[in-house]
Amino acid sequence: MKRATVLALLSATLAKCLVQTGLDVLIASNYSQLAGRKVLVFSNPTGVTPLLHLGVDVMFESGKVNLVGVMGPEHGFRGTVQNGGGESTFVDSKTGLTVYDAYNVNSSVLMEYIRDSGADTVLFDLQDVGVRFYTYIWALYDSMVAAAATDAAFMVVDRPNPITGLDAFGPVLNESFITSYVGRRPIAQVHGMTVGELASMYVGEGWIRDASNGSSLTLTIIKMEGWERSMRFEDTQLPWVLPSPNMPTVDTAMLYGGACMFEGTSLSEGRGTTRPFELLGAPWANESWVQEMRKLDVPKTRYRFQCFTPTTSKFQGTTVCGLQTYMDLRQAGDDDEGFDAPFVGVNLLYTARRLFAAGSTSGEAPTSDSFHWLYSGTSTTYGIDVLTGSPLVREGLESGMTPEQIRESWTPRLQKFREIRKKYLLYH
């Protein structure tokens, strides 16, 4: 009776939604694509139905899917971990399934998970945010490589790109930076694709075959119904579940593709606040930053002076000042086919560096009284270079280039990516 009630409620809810996710389509098919399969699910709290039931729980309770385990990405399967961490492997108390920690591990470790679970199929269901350095699309890539190498089939239950799928923006990852977990292959900083489309690109461009020593992969995309490329997430009428602790709203996701570049600087990118990536600041920043940004008149954005006190991350417990970015998507601009977050981010970096840099502009910790670049972890590679996929943005700013000139410098490779991208688009 309980299962029948859940399915009846789900059917009624789906009728009210403009978009059905791949998970919804899978459930509506009575899991026909999974018949006879031993399924290892890669998911987290975003893998939900419109009724906010976790897909793994729904499949488990249905009794119609042979689940053999779960893999959890950054932040964990049940979403209990902050940025830069995963859960240790454990047994889920609700389902009794082994949950493997799949954050920041290579494909060899994922291969062991597949073998240990006895799976013959990996089912991927994560809500991405449309930005290259968000780690979920590289969890997708690595798990596809592992599936190919172990002869497991791979299925993606597709979900919307929450910041629209209209176009791609920003620099394309340089081949010399493909070892990073925030960039395995040369795609644009804001890619404008769904997870299913990216999976198709990974296979179609030969990247999975190359990374798995020539192994082929049987890939199935369970497509959405009703999604259009111009839709922001709120247009879908689906519930927004935080993909990660610092991604509370769709507006956060829209700005993330530009503002997260401040992670590689001595300024706070707003982590530890209720408005991460909208709020940027430092103890030594002031209202002049807002004044400079207003002079630049960056399309579709507005700015106001704001002070805040981060509860975690940079400047924890210290009051900092800076600005809050607002989007006005009604404004006309030269990026009318989407929101060019990387260009917004470069404008913010340009003004912050010009106003607040003093003396040396490099260092290992955000402790000095000026703007400087931070190294990535324990390496001597700048974090900004890892995030943008090359030294292009940093070196452009250091050489005195304007934001427009920097955007022009990444455009040739971006145009090539846009042409490749067209081959893999599944929706209009």
Model-flagged regions — what are they?
Residues 66-75, 157:
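Short internal beta-strands
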Residues 79-83, 155-178:
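Glycine-rich, charge-decorated loop segments at or immediately adjacent to ligand/cofactor-binding or catalytic sites
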Residues 282-407:
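Conserved functional hotspot residues or short segments at active or partner-binding sites
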Residues 83-119, 131:
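Glycine-rich oxoanion-binding loops at beta->alpha junctions
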Residues 178-256:
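Conserved anion/nucleotide-ligand pocket segment
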Residues 226-316:
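Glycine-rich, aromatic-lined ligand/substrate-binding cores of catalytic
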Residues 1-17:
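Fungal secretory targeting signals
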Residues 128-140:
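Glycine/threonine-rich flexible loop motifs
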